[in-house]
C-alpha cells in the first residue's frame, strides 16, 4: 500500500501479502481451507466442522499475521458471518480476503478495522454501495513483494465498509463487478477466506462462517 512516513517502517511487512500456508480439511459446509500465516504470533484456534475460528493477540504483535477459514478456490458467492472483534488498539482488519491467480491480485472486503483504514493511503476508485452501506474502494500496486507465487508485482483491491459491522452477509459479486471496471480479473481465483489480519497492537476476534 501507499503509506505515510509514520507508517512506512511499521508497514514494511504488514502488507507483504503472505504466501498461503494451506491446511486442507474435510469438506463441511463448503469450507476446505485454513489460512494460518504467522498464527503463532497469537492464540489461533479453529474448527472447520463448525466454521469457527478465533485469534487472540492480547500480548501484542509487531509483525503481520493473517488467519481464517474459507475455500481453496474463491468465487463471487456471498458469505454470511458473525464475529466478536476487538481491535481498537491494533492495526487490524476483519475482512473477506483472497487472491486471483492472473492477472495476479490480492483483495480485501473490509467489514471492520482497528486504527488504520487502508484506503487512507491508497489510490481511490470511488465508492460502491452494498449490503446496507457505502464502501470506499481503493487500489495499490505492490512491487517485488511476497505473494502466492513467491516474489512478484501485483495489484491490491480494497473495499472498506463505512458503516463497520461484525456480522452480516457480504455480497462479494458487488465488489468483484466494481473492481472489474478497474482491471480486476474476476476469474481464475486462488484461495478465499473470512480473515483477521493484524500487524501491531493488541486485539481479539472470534468468527463464525455460516455460508
UniProtKB/Swiss-Prot annotation:
Active site, renumbered = 106 (nucleophile), 197 (proton donor)
Question: How does pH shape activity?
Answer: Optimum pH is 4.0.
What does the annotation record about activity and temperature? Answer: Optimum temperature is 60 degrees Celsius.
- Kindly list the places in or outside the cell where this protein is found, as annotated in its UniProt entry: Secreted
Catalytic activity reported? Endohydrolysis of (1->4)-beta-D-xylosidic linkages in xylans
Q: In which pathway does it act?
A: Glycan degradation; xylan degradation
Gene3D superfamilies linked? 2.60.120.180
> What's the Enzyme Commission number for this chain?
3.2.1.8
Using the record for this protein, list the coiled-coil segments as residue ranges, or answer none. Answer: none
**Enzyme class name:** hydrolase
Mind listing the GO biological process terms from this record? Answer: xylan catabolic process
Entry keyword set: Carbohydrate metabolism, Glycosidase, Hydrolase, Polysaccharide degradation, Secreted, Signal, Xylan degradation
Which terms does the record give in the GO molecular function aspect?
A: endo-1,4-beta-xylanase activity
- Domain GH11: residue ranges: 19-210
Tell me yes or no: is Magnesium among this UniProt entry's keywords.
Answer: no
At the top level of its lineage, which domain of life is listed? Eukaryota
PANTHER family assigned: ENDO-1,4-BETA-XYLANASE A-RELATED (PTHR46828:SF2)
Query: What job does the chain carry out?
Result: Endo-1,4-beta-xylanase involved in the hydrolysis of xylan, a major structural heterogeneous polysaccharide found in plant biomass representing the second most abundant polysaccharide in the biosphere, after cellulose.
Q: What is this protein called?
A: Endo-1,4-beta-xylanase 5
Originating organism = Aspergillus niger
Amino acid at each position: 500500500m501507499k503509506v505515510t512516513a509514520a507508517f512506512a517502517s511499521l508497514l514494511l511487512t504488514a502488507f507483504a501479502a503472505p504466501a498461503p500456508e494451506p491446511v486442507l480439511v474435510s469438506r463441511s459446509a463448503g469450507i476446505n481451507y485454513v489460512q494460518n500465516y504467522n498464527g503463532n504470533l497469537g492464540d489461533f484456534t479453529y474448527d472447520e466442522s463448525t466454521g469457527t475460528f478465533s485469534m487472540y493477540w492480547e500480548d501484542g504483535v509487531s509483525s503481520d499475521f493473517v488467519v481464517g477459514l474459507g475455500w481453496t478456490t474463491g468465487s463471487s458467492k456471498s458469505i454470511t458471518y458473525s464475529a466478536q472483534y476487538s481491535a481498537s488498539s491494533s492495526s487490524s482488519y476483519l475482512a473477506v480476503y483472497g487472491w486471483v491467480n492472473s492477472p495476479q491480485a490480492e483483495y480485501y472486503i473490509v467489514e471492520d478495522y482497528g486504527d488504520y483504514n487502508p484506503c487512507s493511503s491508497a489510490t481511490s476508485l470511488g465508492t460502491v454501495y452494498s449490503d446496507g452501506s457505502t464502501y470506499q474502494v481503493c487500489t495499490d500496486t505492490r512491487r517485488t513483494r511476497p505473494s502466492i507465487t513467491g516474489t512478484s508485482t501485483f495489484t491490491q483491491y480494497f473495499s472498506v465498509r463505512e458503516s463497520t459491522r461484525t456480522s452480516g452477509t457480504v455480497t462479494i459479486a458487488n465488489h468483484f463487478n466494481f473492481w472489474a471496471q478497474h482491471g480486476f480479473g474476476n476469474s481464475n481465483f486462488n484461495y478465499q477466506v473470512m480473515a483477521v489480519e493484524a500487524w501491531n497492537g493488541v486485539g481479539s476476534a472470534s468468527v463464525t462462517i455460516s455460508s
